[in-house]
Amino acid sequence: MQRRIMGIETEFGVTCTFHGHRRLSPDEVARYLFRRVVSWGRSSNVFLRNGARLYLDVGSHPEYATAECDNLIQLVTHDRAGERVLEDLLIDAEQRLADEGIGGDIYLFKNNTDSAGNSYGCHENYLIVRAGEFSRISDVLLPFLVTRQLICGAGKVLQTPKAATFCLSQRAEHIWEGVSSATTRSRPIINTRDEPHADAEKYRRLHVIVGDSNMCESTTMLKVGTASLVLEMIEAGVPFRDFSLDNPIRAIREVSHDLTGRRPVRLAGGRQASALDIQREYYSRAVDYLQTREPNSQIEQVVDLWGRQLDAVESQDFAKVDTEIDWVIKRKLFQRYQDRYNMELSDPKISQLDLAYHDIKRGRGVFDLLQRKGLAARITTDEEIDAAVDTPPQTTRAKLRGEFISAAQEAGRDFTVDWVHLKLNDQAQRTVLCKDPFRSVDERVKRLIASM
């Protein structure tokens, strides 16, 4: 499948402080954040004009699920648009607090762990054909996903009883299964719950919940681009060496703690391979596969960065990627800070900097400041992100959903939507079922809109 439907779901950490002390509980902050949403949507679970879903997840975490996208830059743009949507809610909520005489600053973090050790996720969704053998997909994909933190981890300072250590991944410490139907209780790498949000006879949805939330656009593009390409190669029958892991959960932690990528992890049958070995195998297959594939500049960009990052890890010279990979950007920032102020990695100020990197408020968040200084690469523009806040992807089913929502809101009509249904809540209860996520034009939807 060379054209694939993809989406990213991001849960955000939330807190409210006043002069450095916690002001409100996460539940209370969430209520202020979503008050504007509830006022127009009559719910804290809504779909937006850009086709995305915005809702309050378990544990008072605001969650933004992008609309269906069919190319990488489009997906990165809509992922960033989610930050803008949440930032607008943050500003509105702070104003409400001020109006009620409650001083405080609200923070939304696009990260994966809080100070209490709780974890919240960034989930990737990839449409795959139903006819494929799912067990083979998961078998081949699992070693890739366990080791890809080398190329797309967000980075984290982990405080251990002995010392503080810099790790590749925020999520790695919180994954407890390889493949499972659970998402919260056991946190698998691949979730097998079968909810295709499409024609179930043709498709299923691969739900990957092991990834970190990325701030850097090029890292997000690398994360989803490499996963989609590996899926495409599996579907095309490309042979891969067997890197079945003896214990994926132990391996994911070992990889996260090794910035060199050289520490051996145990494979099934007593063999060993390093994370770098495993990533090199997938990368070399991708380079060969591109020679036979229809040209695609976005995929070529992804494979180029993939190779450069693996070279950087191997040589431990990150100069050629130090604006493109989250964990590399963050580690360089920490090292500069430590050198300037003569402090250890365990210093609380480094932990504060770690958190501030993921603050989504422009002008305050550390990543935003780095990006403005040209120290973090861009693949989209502020104008494109602003447009994506209100405009759905124009090449997928999201266009139909977004147009229906806009028309119904402007006509003052009561409606209900989900990923596949568009419904007018009138006497006729007219409903259109949109089972094809690739379809952006539908006469039935046009007629439904015209009838308003």
Swiss-Prot record:
Annotated ATP binding sites: 53, 66, 419
Keywords, sorted A to Z: ATP-binding, Ligase, Magnesium, Metal-binding, Nucleotide-binding, Ubl conjugation pathway
GO terms assigned for molecular function: ATP binding; ligase activity, forming carbon-nitrogen bonds; magnesium ion binding; ubiquitin-like protein transferase activity
Catalytic activity, as annotated: ATP + [prokaryotic ubiquitin-like protein]-L-glutamate + [protein]-L-lysine = ADP + phosphate + N(6)-([prokaryotic ubiquitin-like protein]-gamma-L-glutamyl)-[protein]-L-lysine
Pathways involved: Protein degradation; proteasomal Pup-dependent pathway; Protein modification; protein pupylation
Binding sites annotated in the UniProt record for Mg(2+): 9, 55, 63
Residues at the catalytic site: 57 (proton acceptor)
Pfam name, any one: Pup_ligase
Enzyme Commission designation: 6.3.1.19
Note: The reaction mechanism probably proceeds via the activation of Pup by phosphorylation of its C-terminal glutamate, which is then subject to nucleophilic attack by the substrate lysine, resulting in an isopeptide bond and the release of phosphate as a good leaving group.
Function (record text): Catalyzes the covalent attachment of the prokaryotic ubiquitin-like protein modifier Pup to the proteasomal substrate proteins, thereby targeting them for proteasomal degradation. This tagging system is termed pupylation. The ligation reaction involves the side-chain carboxylate of the C-terminal glutamate of Pup and the side-chain amino group of a substrate lysine.
Similarity remark: Belongs to the Pup ligase/Pup deamidase family. Pup-conjugating enzyme subfamily.
The protein's name: Pup--protein ligase
Native source organism of the sequence: Mycobacterium sp. (strain KMS)
Gene responsible for this protein: pafA
